[in-house]
């Protein structure tokens, strides 16, 4: 049976940690006839009760692993720590705030099973964001795509599914190339 790993970085997410866990597991259990799963939560030096909540969750679910940083190292460091510790055939990376809906997992996995090595979750709208945020996001993606040999779809964020072979390559890159 293939395994799906879900990497979820958290920084001061005590308000949503349990809700996030329940929604993610609920959607993974719908696929349990075809896939096993693991959840890797990365506590990025939270100053609230995020770590205690994660420990309680992990004590009741053997599919949950926790990586905890001594201080806040940043979102990307947390993601990299997570992907370096996955054991799955595919990895879903998502934010804990549930702007990336776990209800899309099944469709992402279906695309992966059809041969895609990377499946992006793209936002339909950027509702609730300021004009400044919208403009800087547009500038970021335009600049990134001019500098990159590979086009990065706009408004994708970190919500994606990545095949194991891609994860293995990413994990070998030196820090400054990630």
Where do the model's predicted regions map?
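Acceptor/aglycone-binding surface of glycosyltransferases and processive sugar-polymer synthases
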Residues: 69-71, 75-85, 101-178
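A conserved acidic beta->alpha catalytic loop
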Residues: 43-51, 98-99
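Short, well-formed alpha-helical segments that are part of the catalytic scaffolds
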Residues: 13-30
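Cell-envelope/extracellular polymer assembly enzymes that use nucleotide-activated donors
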Residues: 3-5, 38
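Short aromatic/hydrophobic "clamp" motif used to bind/position activated sugar donors
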Residues: 91
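Acidic helix N-cap motif at the loop->helix transition within catalytic regions
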Residues: 15-18, 48-57
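Catalytic metal- and UDP-sugar-binding loop of GT-A-like glycosyltransferases, i.e.
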Residues: 69, 94-96
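Short beta-strand/loop segment that forms part of the nucleotide-sugar
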Residues: 33-46, 67-68
